[in-house]
């Protein structure tokens, strides 16, 4: 962004971990972009989740590489069936250490106070059927960010908006 775009861009979007990364960027650079789209980003740390990740993935990591298990996991994410092959390839490409590291970091992410100084117009998207931690995070972000708009998406689960409803997502981008 600094080298190729003079230090700021029109819009940045992020889903889940990508949303956390975007929020971290905005907390460090209040004028990084004019608009931001944050979907399903958790900003409430969970020590319990953090402590369970290493033993859970330590014992079942090899299962993730099994296609039958990966299909079960994929179905639980409620993604379009035609995305499975990409999902499977991407998942198999992540090392055990990296998967544990990014899941643990994500589970402990918290909103920085400096995020409140962000000047971007931020659109927060969260599925109505997401877990409580994600829903509370969206509300907390909305309360903190003066120029934010909270969109609670009826009947949607985690990540469904940008992954399964790309047409609606693009309409929001263009709005």
Give the positions of each predicted feature:
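Conserved acidic catalytic loop of the alpha/beta-hydrolase fold
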Residues: 1-10
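Short beta-strand immediately N-terminal to the catalytic nucleophile in serine-hydrolase-like folds
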Residues: 12-14, 39
């Amino acid at each position: 962004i600094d080298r190729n775009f003079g230090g700021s861009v029109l819009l940045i979007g992020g889903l889940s971990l990508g949303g956390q990364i975007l929020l971290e960027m905005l907390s460090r650079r209040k004028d990084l972009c004019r608009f931001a789209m944050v979907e399903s980003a958790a900003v409430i740390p969970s020590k319990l989740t953090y402590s369970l990740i290493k033993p859970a993935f330590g014992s079942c990591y090899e299962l993730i590489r099994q296609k039958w298990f990966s299909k079960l996991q994929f179905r639980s994410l409620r993604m379009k069936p035609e995305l499975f092959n990409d999902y499977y390839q991407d998942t198999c490409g992540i090392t055990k250490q990296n998967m544990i590291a990014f899941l643990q970091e994500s589970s402990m992410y918290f909103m920085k106070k400096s995020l409140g100084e962000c000047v971007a117009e931020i659109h927060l998207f969260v599925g109505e059927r997401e877990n409580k931690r994600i829903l509370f995070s969206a509300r907390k972000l909305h309360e903190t960010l003066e120029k934010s708009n909270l969109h609670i998406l009826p009947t949607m689960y985690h990540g469904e908006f940008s992954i399964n409803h790309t047409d609606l997502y693009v309409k929001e981008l263009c709005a």
